[in-house]
C-alpha cells in the first residue's frame, strides 16, 4: 500500500519539472537595455524575435530628453552569426555601445555592426528600417528655392543701366550735326575823321542831351 503514494509523488514531481519554462539566457531577445546617449538622452533598447525558427530579430529603441521623445526600429538576422548563436549578450552590448556614442540614438547609425559578428555578412547586422526622426531638418540645410536672393536684383539693375547707356549713345549717333550760322559781312562804318567832325557839329548845334543822336545822324548822312 505504501507503493501507491510513492508512485504518485514521483509522478507529480516529474510533471512539475516538465511544466517549468526553460530559463532564458541573459542578453537574449525579450530583455531591456537602459543607456544614456552622448546628448544625455535616456533610452531603452528592446530586442524581440519575430517568431520561433524565423531567425529575424527586431530591435526597438525608445528615447526621451527635455525637449522631445523619439524612437526607431532595426531589423536583422543576427542568428546567422555563430558568436550570437553561442551567446547573444556580447552582440547586444556592442550594439548598445554604438548607440551610446551618438548624440541622438536614432540619428547617425543607420546600421549597427557589432564587432563579434562583423565578418558574418550584412544580414547579421541590424539595419534601421524606421524612425520618428526621419525627415527632420538637418543643421546645415540649404535655403529653400522660394527664398529670394539679392544678387539677381543687382544684376538686373546693372543690365538696365548698361542698356540705357547704349540707347543714349545710339541717340547721339543719330542726331543731326548742328550748323553754325554764317556771319553777315558788316558794313563799313563812317570814317574816323567824319566821326570827329560830326561830334563837333552836334556839339555846336544840338542840345546837350541829344548831342550823341545828332552826331550819329550827321555821320550817317555824310556816309
Curated annotation (Swiss-Prot):
<dbReference type="GO" id="GO:0007267">
    <property type="term" value="P:cell-cell signaling"/>
</dbReference>
<feature type="disulfide bond">
    <location>
        <begin position="81"/>
        <end position="117"/>
    </location>
</feature>
<feature type="disulfide bond">
    <location>
        <begin position="206"/>
        <end position="214"/>
    </location>
</feature>
<dbReference type="GO" id="GO:0005576">
    <property type="term" value="C:extracellular region"/>
</dbReference>
<feature type="compositionally biased region" description="Polar residues">
    <location>
        <begin position="125"/>
        <end position="144"/>
    </location>
</feature>
<feature type="region of interest" description="Disordered">
    <location>
        <begin position="23"/>
        <end position="45"/>
    </location>
</feature>
<keyword id="KW-0340">Growth factor binding</keyword>
<protein>
    <recommendedName>
        <fullName>Fibroblast growth factor-binding protein 2</fullName>
    </recommendedName>
</protein>
<feature type="disulfide bond">
    <location>
        <begin position="43"/>
        <end position="63"/>
    </location>
</feature>
<dbReference type="GO" id="GO:0019838">
    <property type="term" value="F:growth factor binding"/>
</dbReference>
<comment type="similarity">
    <text>Belongs to the fibroblast growth factor-binding protein family.</text>
</comment>
<feature type="region of interest" description="Disordered">
    <location>
        <begin position="120"/>
        <end position="201"/>
    </location>
</feature>
<keyword id="KW-0964">Secreted</keyword>
<feature type="disulfide bond">
    <location>
        <begin position="72"/>
        <end position="106"/>
    </location>
</feature>
<keyword id="KW-0732">Signal</keyword>
<dbReference type="InterPro" id="IPR010510">
    <property type="entry name" value="FGF1-bd"/>
</dbReference>
<feature type="signal peptide">
    <location>
        <begin position="1"/>
        <end position="19"/>
    </location>
</feature>
<dbReference type="Pfam" id="PF06473">
    <property type="entry name" value="FGF-BP1"/>
</dbReference>
<keyword id="KW-1015">Disulfide bond</keyword>
<feature type="compositionally biased region" description="Low complexity">
    <location>
        <begin position="175"/>
        <end position="186"/>
    </location>
</feature>
Amino acid at each position: 500500500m505504501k507503493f501507491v503514494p510513492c508512485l504518485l509523488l514521483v509522478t507529480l514531481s516529474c510533471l512539475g519539472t516538465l511544466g517549468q519554462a526553460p530559463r532564458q539566457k541573459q542578453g537574449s531577445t525579450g530583455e531591456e537595455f537602459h543607456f544614456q546617449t552622448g546628448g544625455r538622452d535616456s533610452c531603452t533598447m528592446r530586442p524581440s524575435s519575430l517568431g520561433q525558427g524565423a531567425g529575424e530579430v527586431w530591435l526597438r529603441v525608445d528615447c526621451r530628453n527635455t525637449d522631445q521623445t523619439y524612437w526607431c526600429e532595426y531589423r536583422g538576422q543576427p542568428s546567422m552569426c555563430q558568436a550570437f548563436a553561442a551567446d547573444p549578450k556580447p552582440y547586444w552590448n556592442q550594439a548598445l555601445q554604438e548607440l551610446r556614442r551618438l548624440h541622438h540614438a536614432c540619428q547617425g547609425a543607420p546600421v549597427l555592426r557589432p564587432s563579434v559578428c562583423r565578418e558574418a555578412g550584412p544580414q547579421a547586422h541590424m539595419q534601421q528600417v524606421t524612425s520618428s526622426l526621419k525627415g527632420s531638418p538637418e543643421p546645415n540645410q540649404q535655403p529653400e528655392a522660394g527664398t529670394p536672393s539679392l544678387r539677381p536684383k543687382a544684376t538686373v539693375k546693372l543690365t538696365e543701366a548698361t542698356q540705357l547707356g547704349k540707347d543714349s549713345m545710339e541717340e547721339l549717333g543719330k542726331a543731326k550735326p548742328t550748323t553754325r550760322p554764317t556771319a553777315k559781312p558788316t558794313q563799313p562804318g563812317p570814317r574816323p575823321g567824319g566821326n570827329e567832325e560830326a561830334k563837333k557839329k552836334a556839339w555846336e548845334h544840338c542840345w546837350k542831351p541829344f548831342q550823341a543822336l545828332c552826331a550819329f545822324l550827321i555821320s550817317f548822312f555824310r556816309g
